Every structure is written in C-alpha cells, then in structure tokens.
Amino acid sequence: MEHLGPHHLHPGHAEPISFGIEQILNSPDQGGCMGPNSRLQDGDYGLGCLVPGAYTYGGGGSAAGAGAGGTGAYGAGGPGGPGGPAGGGGGACSMGPLPGSYNVNMDLAGGPGPGGDGGGGGAARRALSAAGVIRVPAHRPLAGAVAHPQPLATGLPTVPSVPAVPGVNNLTGLTFPWMESNRRYTKDRFTGLPYQNRTPPKKKKPRTSFTRLQICELEKRFHRQKYLASAERAALAKALKMTDAQVKTWFQNRRTKWRRQTAEEREAESEQANRILLQLQQEAFQKSLAQPLPADPLCVHNSSLFALQNLQPWSDDSTKITSVTSVASACE
C-alpha cells in the first residue's frame, strides 16, 4: 500500500491515515510507525502512529501480497488482498478487549508469503504470537470489563494489567459515610439552643405520694415547728416510715408554700386596711359638709361677711340662701 504524502492533503479535509503490514514491519521504504517521518510527533492525530487506521476504514490487501485485510476502526477488517486466497477479517493490528483502553499488537517477525492460506487472520495470529502489547489507556475501564476480562493469547509479553476486583459489579450498591445526606446532621445541629444539645434531657422522676396519715402528722409538726434539726427530722422519718430525704423535701416545699400564702394574706390585709381607711375619710368629709359652721360675731353684724362665710357653691339647697338673707336683714 502506497504512502500518501503531504501534497495529497486538501484544505478542510483530514488526511486518511494509511495502514499496512510494511508499517508494522518498520519497512525502510515506507518509514515505519516509529520512524522519524512518522506522525508520532503530530498532535493532531493523537494515536495515529500507534493505530494508523483507528479512524478510517481499511482498504484492500497490501501490495506485497500478504493476504491480510486492511483494518478499520477498532480492528474492522476489509476485503482480502490479491496475494491471499481468503481475506481475513482481522488485521495485524487489533484492539484490546477492554473498552476504554487500546491494545496494539505489532508484528515483529514478518507476515506470510504470497501464497499463504492464513490471509489476514493468519497474519493477525502470527502478530499475536510474536508481538508485544502496547496499552494506551484512554479512560477508566467499565466495571463489567474489569470484572470479566477477555483472555489474551498465551506466550505474549504483556504489560501487567489491573487485576479483577471481586464484587466490582456491586460498587453501585455500596454506600459511604460521605455519600449520605447531611440533612440529619443539620437537623440535630440546629435543633434548640447549643447548650441543650450538649447534655441529654433528664428523665423525670415519678411524683412521690404519701398516705393521708403521713400528711396529717407532717402538717401537725409543721404548725408547731417550721424548721427541724437533723435528729428531729430523722426521728420523724422513722416514726412515719419515710426516708430522711423525703421528710426534708416535704418540709422545704411546705415552707415555700407557707411563705407564698403568708405574702398573699398580708397583701390582702393591706388592701383591705387601705379600703377601710378611704371609706372612713369619705364619711368624715361628708359629715363635715353636713354640719353648719359656727357663726362669727363679726360676720353676724356685717351682712356681706356673713353671706361670704355661709357661701357654699356646691350646695343646691336654696333654703340656706334664704336663711342667710333673712339673718342679714335681721341684723340690719
């Protein structure tokens, strides 16, 4: 297969990358894949030097009559060449079994003769028997491919690959702490005040109930004595079949209740005393208004002063006014 030079390039069209047995054998006339004129340094082709026919479908057989079919993308073979009776589907360069990685088998021992019966398949088998594997990972392999890799031909010097991990297919069912939602942590973090989350709430104790006889004896003792000494409290607890802590707690609660009742009673008595005092003051004021003022001797002889002394604007009694006028006229 002849090599296309740069003068065959058309603007706007990518050059079809040729592929043949000569390039695999590093033929000097075609300038092998690793030659100085190869496209290894060309960044536009990427894997073109390793897989020359990775992006174009291969044509017919080689000019040397090897009988190997041209390989297209991912090892798709073309029709057999004129040298071999049966063209094989696979070429000398084949893709690896792992999806996402590429294995290029390069034949280093040479192809079959023009009359070989293997064709392209024979060249591929010979290439696999004496070729090295160049692995070019493109992306992460799928879980199914890693779990079930296809076996390669025996006797090949291969690069150590990733070993099969048991249970890789179940990776989707695995959960990790960092995958879990943070909502429950957020809920626990923002519920209530910070100091409420530090200590768990205390469990409430059931209320202690006493018998009627015990309560009556405690009330009698409390009316006689508001405070008990330690010995007295212990004797009372023993007599009532109670613990010392129960008697102590009951007296503390009873004193608190007694103080509250005493304060309420004092407040009620004070309000009642103030109410009685206001009532007495009002009655005294009403009596003072009802009693007549003693007549002044000076005012008795002066009618104007007498009228001014007996003037009561708040009084509606007209009889007083008439009496004042009669007294004044009598004095005159």
UniProtKB/Swiss-Prot annotation:
One Gene Ontology cellular component annotation held by this UniProt entry: nucleus
Name any one GO molecular function: DNA binding
Tissue expression profile of the protein:
Expressed in various embryonic tissues, including branchial arches, some component of the nervous system and spleen.
Biological process (GO) annotations held by this record are:
animal organ formation; cell fate commitment; cell population proliferation; central nervous system development; lymph node development; neuron differentiation; positive regulation of stem cell proliferation; positive regulation of transcription by RNA polymerase II
Gene3D superfamilies for this protein: Homeodomain-like (1.10.10.60)
User: What ranges are recorded for DNA binding?
Assistant: 203-262
Q: Where in the cell is it found?
A: Nucleus
Task: Supply the alphabetized keyword list.
Answer: Acetylation, Developmental protein, DNA-binding, Homeobox, Nucleus
One of this protein's Pfam families, by short name? Homeodomain
Q: Has the keyword DNA-binding been applied to this entry?
A: yes
- What protein does this entry describe? T-cell leukemia homeobox protein 1
What's the encoding gene here?
A: Tlx1
